[in-house]
A protein has these predicted regions:
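Mid-to-C-terminal alpha-helical segments outside catalytic/metal-binding sites
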Residues: 351-377
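Structural recognition of the beta-strand scaffold that forms the well-ordered cores
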Residues: 37-42, 64-70, 105-110, 116-118, ...
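Second-shell residues forming the walls of enzyme active-site clefts
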Residues: 49-53, 77-100, 192-356
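C-terminal motif of bacterial Sec signal peptides marking the signal peptidase cleavage site
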Residues: 15-16
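Alpha-helical scaffold segments that flank or form the walls of functional sites
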Residues: 139-160, 242, 317-320
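N-terminal hydrophobic targeting/anchoring segments and the immediately downstream early-domain regions
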Residues: 20-124, 326-328, 370
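Sec-dependent signal peptide recognition
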Residues: 2-8
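Surface-exposed loop and adjacent secondary-structure segments within mature catalytic domains
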Residues: 114, 122-134, 150-240
Length: 377
Protein backbone atom coordinates (compact mmCIF):
# COMPACT_ATOMS: atom_id res chain seq x y z
CA UNK A 1 0.00 0.00 0.00
CA UNK A 2 2.84 2.40 0.89
CA UNK A 3 4.48 1.71 -2.45
CA UNK A 4 1.21 2.45 -4.20
CA UNK A 5 0.77 5.74 -2.35
CA UNK A 6 4.36 6.72 -3.07
CA UNK A 7 3.85 6.00 -6.76
CA UNK A 8 0.63 8.00 -6.77
CA UNK A 9 2.37 10.90 -5.00
CA UNK A 10 5.13 10.85 -7.61
CA UNK A 11 2.58 10.92 -10.44
CA UNK A 12 0.78 13.86 -8.82
CA UNK A 13 4.04 15.75 -8.46
CA UNK A 14 4.87 15.10 -12.11
CA UNK A 15 1.36 16.14 -13.13
CA UNK A 16 1.57 19.33 -11.13
CA UNK A 17 4.98 20.26 -12.47
CA UNK A 18 4.12 19.54 -16.08
CA UNK A 19 0.72 21.19 -15.85
CA UNK A 20 2.21 24.31 -14.28
CA UNK A 21 4.94 24.61 -16.85
CA UNK A 22 2.58 24.03 -19.77
CA UNK A 23 -0.54 25.84 -18.62
CA UNK A 24 0.45 28.83 -20.70
CA UNK A 25 2.18 26.71 -23.32
CA UNK A 26 -0.02 27.93 -26.14
CA UNK A 27 1.22 31.49 -25.51
CA UNK A 28 4.93 30.67 -25.67
CA UNK A 29 7.36 31.60 -28.41
CA UNK A 30 7.04 29.45 -31.58
CA UNK A 31 9.99 27.19 -30.76
CA UNK A 32 8.34 25.97 -27.56
CA UNK A 33 4.72 25.62 -28.68
CA UNK A 34 3.38 22.18 -27.65
CA UNK A 35 2.78 21.17 -31.26
CA UNK A 36 2.10 17.52 -30.46
CA UNK A 37 -1.28 18.56 -29.10
CA UNK A 38 -2.35 19.27 -32.69
CA UNK A 39 -2.09 15.58 -33.63
CA UNK A 40 -4.63 12.75 -33.42
CA UNK A 41 -2.66 9.65 -34.33
CA UNK A 42 -3.23 5.93 -34.80
CA UNK A 43 -0.87 3.20 -33.63
CA UNK A 44 -0.44 -0.54 -33.73
CA UNK A 45 -0.91 -2.84 -30.77
CA UNK A 46 -3.42 -3.90 -28.16
CA UNK A 47 -1.41 -3.00 -25.07
CA UNK A 48 0.89 -0.30 -23.77
CA UNK A 49 3.49 -2.54 -22.14
CA UNK A 50 6.41 -3.08 -24.48
CA UNK A 51 4.92 -0.80 -27.14
CA UNK A 52 7.68 1.63 -28.11
CA UNK A 53 5.48 3.32 -30.72
CA UNK A 54 2.87 4.28 -28.13
CA UNK A 55 5.46 5.43 -25.63
CA UNK A 56 7.09 7.65 -28.26
CA UNK A 57 3.78 9.19 -29.38
CA UNK A 58 2.61 9.89 -25.84
CA UNK A 59 5.87 10.78 -24.10
CA UNK A 60 8.07 12.22 -26.86
CA UNK A 61 5.70 13.67 -29.45
CA UNK A 62 3.13 14.36 -26.71
CA UNK A 63 0.18 13.95 -29.07
CA UNK A 64 -3.15 15.49 -28.20
CA UNK A 65 -5.06 12.32 -28.96
CA UNK A 66 -4.96 8.73 -30.15
CA UNK A 67 -7.48 6.99 -32.41
CA UNK A 68 -8.41 3.34 -31.98
CA UNK A 69 -9.35 0.82 -34.67
CA UNK A 70 -10.68 -2.69 -34.34
CA UNK A 71 -8.95 -4.18 -37.37
CA UNK A 72 -5.67 -3.59 -39.14
CA UNK A 73 -6.43 -2.57 -42.73
CA UNK A 74 -3.49 -4.54 -44.10
CA UNK A 75 -3.61 -7.81 -42.18
CA UNK A 76 -7.24 -7.90 -41.05
CA UNK A 77 -6.04 -8.85 -37.57
CA UNK A 78 -6.86 -7.06 -34.32
CA UNK A 79 -5.24 -3.63 -34.32
CA UNK A 80 -6.20 -1.98 -31.03
CA UNK A 81 -9.39 -3.72 -29.88
CA UNK A 82 -9.73 -7.45 -29.31
CA UNK A 83 -12.20 -7.68 -26.40
CA UNK A 84 -14.10 -5.43 -23.98
CA UNK A 85 -11.69 -6.27 -21.17
CA UNK A 86 -8.62 -5.66 -23.31
CA UNK A 87 -9.69 -2.23 -24.59
CA UNK A 88 -10.58 -1.07 -21.07
CA UNK A 89 -7.08 -1.99 -19.92
CA UNK A 90 -5.51 -0.37 -22.98
CA UNK A 91 -7.26 2.97 -22.54
CA UNK A 92 -6.62 2.98 -18.80
CA UNK A 93 -2.92 2.37 -19.39
CA UNK A 94 -2.80 5.03 -22.11
CA UNK A 95 -4.26 7.61 -19.76
CA UNK A 96 -1.88 6.61 -16.98
CA UNK A 97 1.09 6.96 -19.35
CA UNK A 98 -0.14 10.35 -20.58
CA UNK A 99 -0.58 11.58 -17.03
CA UNK A 100 2.91 10.45 -16.11
CA UNK A 101 4.61 11.93 -19.20
CA UNK A 102 2.57 15.08 -19.86
CA UNK A 103 0.45 15.78 -16.80
CA UNK A 104 -2.75 15.71 -18.85
CA UNK A 105 -5.26 13.25 -20.20
CA UNK A 106 -5.57 12.11 -23.80
CA UNK A 107 -8.42 12.51 -26.19
CA UNK A 108 -9.07 8.88 -27.13
CA UNK A 109 -11.16 8.70 -30.28
CA UNK A 110 -12.88 6.07 -32.39
CA UNK A 111 -15.53 5.88 -35.10
CA UNK A 112 -18.69 4.46 -33.55
CA UNK A 113 -21.53 5.56 -35.82
CA UNK A 114 -23.68 2.46 -35.41
CA UNK A 115 -24.25 -0.24 -38.02
CA UNK A 116 -21.43 -0.78 -40.51
CA UNK A 117 -18.98 1.62 -38.86
CA UNK A 118 -18.63 0.46 -35.28
CA UNK A 119 -15.18 -0.15 -33.78
CA UNK A 120 -16.81 -1.77 -30.74
CA UNK A 121 -18.39 -4.41 -32.94
CA UNK A 122 -20.51 -7.49 -32.38
CA UNK A 123 -17.49 -9.60 -33.40
CA UNK A 124 -15.94 -8.62 -30.08
CA UNK A 125 -19.02 -9.40 -28.01
CA UNK A 126 -20.62 -5.96 -28.05
CA UNK A 127 -24.35 -5.56 -28.61
CA UNK A 128 -25.52 -4.82 -32.17
CA UNK A 129 -26.27 -1.20 -33.06
CA UNK A 130 -28.65 0.11 -35.73
CA UNK A 131 -27.18 2.02 -38.68
CA UNK A 132 -28.03 5.71 -38.90
CA UNK A 133 -30.16 5.06 -41.98
CA UNK A 134 -32.45 2.77 -39.97
CA UNK A 135 -32.79 5.41 -37.25
CA UNK A 136 -33.62 8.04 -39.84
CA UNK A 137 -36.15 5.79 -41.54
CA UNK A 138 -37.86 5.17 -38.19
CA UNK A 139 -38.09 8.91 -37.62
CA UNK A 140 -38.28 8.62 -33.84
CA UNK A 141 -35.76 10.98 -32.17
CA UNK A 142 -36.59 9.63 -28.71
CA UNK A 143 -35.61 6.14 -29.86
CA UNK A 144 -32.45 7.53 -31.45
CA UNK A 145 -31.48 9.29 -28.22
CA UNK A 146 -32.10 6.09 -26.24
CA UNK A 147 -30.00 4.03 -28.65
CA UNK A 148 -27.25 6.65 -28.62
CA UNK A 149 -27.23 6.76 -24.82
CA UNK A 150 -26.85 2.96 -24.70
CA UNK A 151 -24.10 3.08 -27.30
CA UNK A 152 -22.42 5.97 -25.48
CA UNK A 153 -22.38 4.06 -22.20
CA UNK A 154 -20.55 1.22 -23.96
CA UNK A 155 -18.10 3.66 -25.54
CA UNK A 156 -17.36 5.36 -22.25
CA UNK A 157 -16.97 2.02 -20.47
CA UNK A 158 -14.31 1.17 -23.06
CA UNK A 159 -12.39 4.32 -22.11
CA UNK A 160 -13.11 6.16 -25.37
CA UNK A 161 -14.05 9.77 -24.68
CA UNK A 162 -14.44 11.17 -28.20
CA UNK A 163 -16.80 9.50 -30.67
CA UNK A 164 -16.13 10.60 -34.25
CA UNK A 165 -19.84 10.66 -35.08
CA UNK A 166 -22.55 11.44 -36.09
CA UNK A 167 -22.39 11.57 -39.87
CA UNK A 168 -24.50 14.57 -40.89
CA UNK A 169 -23.94 14.13 -44.61
CA UNK A 170 -27.25 14.45 -46.43
CA UNK A 171 -27.96 11.52 -48.77
CA UNK A 172 -28.12 13.63 -51.93
CA UNK A 173 -26.87 10.79 -54.14
CA UNK A 174 -28.58 7.46 -53.35
CA UNK A 175 -25.67 5.63 -55.00
CA UNK A 176 -22.97 7.46 -53.03
CA UNK A 177 -20.40 4.77 -52.09
CA UNK A 178 -18.72 6.59 -49.19
CA UNK A 179 -21.63 6.97 -46.79
CA UNK A 180 -25.09 6.49 -48.34
CA UNK A 181 -24.97 2.90 -49.62
CA UNK A 182 -23.32 1.86 -46.35
CA UNK A 183 -26.26 3.15 -44.32
CA UNK A 184 -24.12 5.80 -42.63
CA UNK A 185 -26.47 8.72 -43.36
CA UNK A 186 -29.70 9.48 -41.53
CA UNK A 187 -31.70 10.75 -44.48
CA UNK A 188 -31.94 12.58 -47.80
CA UNK A 189 -34.02 15.19 -45.95
CA UNK A 190 -31.77 17.74 -44.20
CA UNK A 191 -34.41 18.42 -41.54
CA UNK A 192 -34.53 14.73 -40.64
CA UNK A 193 -30.71 14.71 -40.48
CA UNK A 194 -30.85 17.62 -38.03
CA UNK A 195 -33.50 15.95 -35.85
CA UNK A 196 -31.68 12.61 -35.74
CA UNK A 197 -28.21 14.11 -35.25
CA UNK A 198 -29.50 16.27 -32.41
CA UNK A 199 -30.93 13.21 -30.66
CA UNK A 200 -27.73 11.22 -31.28
CA UNK A 201 -25.54 13.96 -29.81
CA UNK A 202 -27.79 14.42 -26.80
CA UNK A 203 -27.63 10.69 -26.08
CA UNK A 204 -23.84 10.70 -26.30
CA UNK A 205 -23.61 13.72 -24.01
CA UNK A 206 -25.84 12.04 -21.44
CA UNK A 207 -23.41 9.12 -21.50
CA UNK A 208 -20.43 11.46 -21.06
CA UNK A 209 -18.99 11.13 -24.57
CA UNK A 210 -17.88 13.94 -26.91
CA UNK A 211 -18.92 13.91 -30.57
CA UNK A 212 -17.92 15.18 -34.01
CA UNK A 213 -20.11 16.25 -36.92
CA UNK A 214 -18.81 14.91 -40.23
CA UNK A 215 -17.90 15.31 -43.07
CA UNK A 216 -17.89 19.10 -43.70
CA UNK A 217 -19.04 20.52 -46.10
CA UNK A 218 -20.74 17.29 -47.18
CA UNK A 219 -19.83 13.93 -48.74
CA UNK A 220 -23.34 12.71 -49.51
CA UNK A 221 -23.46 13.87 -53.13
CA UNK A 222 -20.19 12.37 -54.36
CA UNK A 223 -19.96 9.57 -56.91
CA UNK A 224 -16.70 8.25 -55.48
CA UNK A 225 -15.07 7.66 -52.09
CA UNK A 226 -12.28 9.90 -50.78
CA UNK A 227 -10.69 6.90 -49.04
CA UNK A 228 -9.50 5.80 -52.47
CA UNK A 229 -8.74 8.95 -54.43
CA UNK A 230 -9.64 12.43 -55.63
CA UNK A 231 -13.33 13.33 -55.23
CA UNK A 232 -14.89 16.25 -57.12
CA UNK A 233 -18.39 17.29 -56.01
CA UNK A 234 -18.51 20.53 -57.99
CA UNK A 235 -21.35 19.28 -60.21
CA UNK A 236 -23.18 17.20 -57.59
CA UNK A 237 -23.11 19.20 -54.35
CA UNK A 238 -26.14 21.11 -53.12
CA UNK A 239 -24.75 23.40 -50.43
CA UNK A 240 -28.14 24.75 -49.40
CA UNK A 241 -29.17 21.24 -48.41
CA UNK A 242 -25.82 19.85 -47.27
CA UNK A 243 -24.86 22.74 -45.00
CA UNK A 244 -28.24 22.91 -43.25
CA UNK A 245 -27.29 20.39 -40.50
CA UNK A 246 -24.09 22.28 -39.69
CA UNK A 247 -25.86 25.63 -39.61
CA UNK A 248 -28.55 24.33 -37.24
CA UNK A 249 -26.36 22.27 -34.90
CA UNK A 250 -23.69 24.98 -34.60
CA UNK A 251 -26.39 27.50 -33.72
CA UNK A 252 -27.75 25.12 -31.06
CA UNK A 253 -24.29 24.66 -29.51
CA UNK A 254 -24.22 20.94 -30.30
CA UNK A 255 -21.05 20.86 -32.41
CA UNK A 256 -18.37 19.59 -30.00
CA UNK A 257 -16.06 19.28 -33.00
CA UNK A 258 -16.36 19.10 -36.77
CA UNK A 259 -14.48 16.74 -39.08
CA UNK A 260 -13.63 17.86 -42.59
CA UNK A 261 -14.19 16.04 -45.89
CA UNK A 262 -11.50 15.56 -48.52
CA UNK A 263 -13.89 16.66 -51.28
CA UNK A 264 -13.11 19.21 -53.97
CA UNK A 265 -15.75 21.78 -54.89
CA UNK A 266 -14.69 24.44 -57.36
CA UNK A 267 -17.58 26.58 -56.19
CA UNK A 268 -15.93 26.89 -52.77
CA UNK A 269 -12.25 26.71 -53.69
CA UNK A 270 -10.81 26.31 -57.21
CA UNK A 271 -7.51 24.92 -55.91
CA UNK A 272 -7.81 22.72 -52.81
CA UNK A 273 -10.11 20.09 -51.30
CA UNK A 274 -12.10 21.16 -48.25
CA UNK A 275 -9.66 19.88 -45.63
CA UNK A 276 -6.90 22.05 -47.09
CA UNK A 277 -9.05 25.01 -48.10
CA UNK A 278 -8.96 28.39 -46.36
CA UNK A 279 -12.05 29.41 -48.34
CA UNK A 280 -14.00 26.39 -47.06
CA UNK A 281 -12.83 26.17 -43.44
CA UNK A 282 -11.66 29.63 -42.42
CA UNK A 283 -13.96 31.82 -44.50
CA UNK A 284 -17.07 29.66 -44.69
CA UNK A 285 -17.18 27.39 -41.62
CA UNK A 286 -15.60 29.85 -39.20
CA UNK A 287 -16.71 33.03 -40.95
CA UNK A 288 -20.17 32.55 -42.43
CA UNK A 289 -21.31 29.80 -40.06
CA UNK A 290 -19.56 31.42 -37.07
CA UNK A 291 -18.12 28.14 -35.78
CA UNK A 292 -15.62 28.71 -32.99
CA UNK A 293 -14.93 25.14 -31.90
CA UNK A 294 -12.41 22.48 -32.84
CA UNK A 295 -12.00 21.35 -36.44
CA UNK A 296 -10.33 17.97 -36.98
CA UNK A 297 -9.21 16.74 -40.38
CA UNK A 298 -10.31 13.45 -41.80
CA UNK A 299 -7.39 11.06 -42.16
CA UNK A 300 -4.52 12.71 -44.02
CA UNK A 301 -3.37 9.30 -45.27
CA UNK A 302 -6.58 8.70 -47.25
CA UNK A 303 -6.18 8.41 -51.01
CA UNK A 304 -7.76 11.78 -51.81
CA UNK A 305 -4.94 13.51 -49.90
CA UNK A 306 -2.07 11.03 -50.07
CA UNK A 307 -2.12 10.77 -53.86
CA UNK A 308 -1.90 14.55 -54.32
CA UNK A 309 0.15 15.72 -51.32
CA UNK A 310 2.61 14.30 -48.84
CA UNK A 311 1.45 14.15 -45.24
CA UNK A 312 3.77 17.03 -44.32
CA UNK A 313 2.50 19.36 -47.06
CA UNK A 314 -1.11 18.40 -46.35
CA UNK A 315 -0.62 19.14 -42.65
CA UNK A 316 0.71 22.64 -43.35
CA UNK A 317 -2.13 23.42 -45.76
CA UNK A 318 -4.73 22.11 -43.31
CA UNK A 319 -3.39 24.26 -40.49
CA UNK A 320 -3.29 27.27 -42.80
CA UNK A 321 -6.95 26.56 -43.58
CA UNK A 322 -7.82 26.78 -39.85
CA UNK A 323 -8.00 23.05 -39.13
CA UNK A 324 -6.96 22.56 -35.50
CA UNK A 325 -6.20 18.86 -35.20
CA UNK A 326 -4.57 16.60 -37.78
CA UNK A 327 -5.73 12.99 -38.02
CA UNK A 328 -3.03 10.53 -39.09
CA UNK A 329 -4.60 7.10 -38.70
CA UNK A 330 -1.71 4.89 -39.87
CA UNK A 331 -4.45 2.44 -40.91
CA UNK A 332 -5.23 3.04 -44.57
CA UNK A 333 -3.51 -0.10 -45.81
CA UNK A 334 -0.09 1.45 -45.30
CA UNK A 335 1.98 2.85 -42.46
CA UNK A 336 4.21 5.90 -42.80
CA UNK A 337 6.90 5.36 -40.21
CA UNK A 338 7.71 8.46 -38.22
CA UNK A 339 4.82 10.41 -39.78
CA UNK A 340 3.98 12.23 -36.54
CA UNK A 341 7.57 13.29 -36.00
CA UNK A 342 7.89 14.43 -39.63
CA UNK A 343 4.71 16.48 -39.37
CA UNK A 344 5.97 18.20 -36.21
CA UNK A 345 9.26 19.00 -37.96
CA UNK A 346 7.36 20.36 -40.97
CA UNK A 347 5.20 22.56 -38.74
CA UNK A 348 8.29 23.94 -37.02
CA UNK A 349 9.80 24.70 -40.41
CA UNK A 350 6.63 26.45 -41.53
CA UNK A 351 6.66 28.54 -38.36
CA UNK A 352 10.26 29.53 -39.02
CA UNK A 353 9.67 30.61 -42.62
CA UNK A 354 6.39 32.36 -41.94
CA UNK A 355 4.00 29.99 -43.69
CA UNK A 356 2.32 29.33 -40.33
CA UNK A 357 1.53 31.81 -37.59
CA UNK A 358 2.37 31.01 -33.97
CA UNK A 359 -0.70 33.00 -32.93
CA UNK A 360 -2.99 30.85 -35.11
CA UNK A 361 -1.43 27.62 -33.84
CA UNK A 362 -1.76 28.84 -30.25
CA UNK A 363 -5.46 29.35 -30.92
CA UNK A 364 -5.73 25.81 -32.30
CA UNK A 365 -3.97 24.41 -29.25
CA UNK A 366 -6.42 26.27 -27.03
CA UNK A 367 -9.31 24.70 -28.95
CA UNK A 368 -7.82 21.24 -28.40
CA UNK A 369 -7.49 21.99 -24.69
CA UNK A 370 -11.03 23.36 -24.52
CA UNK A 371 -12.38 20.10 -25.95
CA UNK A 372 -10.16 18.04 -23.66
CA UNK A 373 -11.39 19.99 -20.64
CA UNK A 374 -14.85 18.60 -21.32
CA UNK A 375 -13.77 14.97 -20.90
CA UNK A 376 -15.82 13.50 -18.08
CA UNK A 377 -13.86 11.91 -15.21
Amino acid sequence: MRARLAALFLVLIVEGCVATSSSDGAARKPSSLPLGELLLVGFGGTQVEGNDEVRSLVCDVKVGGLILFERDARSGEARNISSPEQVRQLTSDLQALALLCTGRRLLIAADNEGGAVMRLSTRLGYLPTPPPQALGDAGDPAATALESRRMGATIREAGINWNLAPVVDVAVNPLNPAVVTLGRTFSSDPQQVIIQARAFIQGMHEAGVLTSLKHFPGHGSSRTDSHHGFVDVTETADLTIELAPYRALIKEGLADSIMTAHVFNRGLDPWNPATLSRFTIKRYLRGKLDYKGLVVSDDLLMGAIRQQYGVEEASILALQASVDMLLISQNQGRVERGAAERVIAAIRGALSDGRLSSKALATSIQRVRALRSRITP
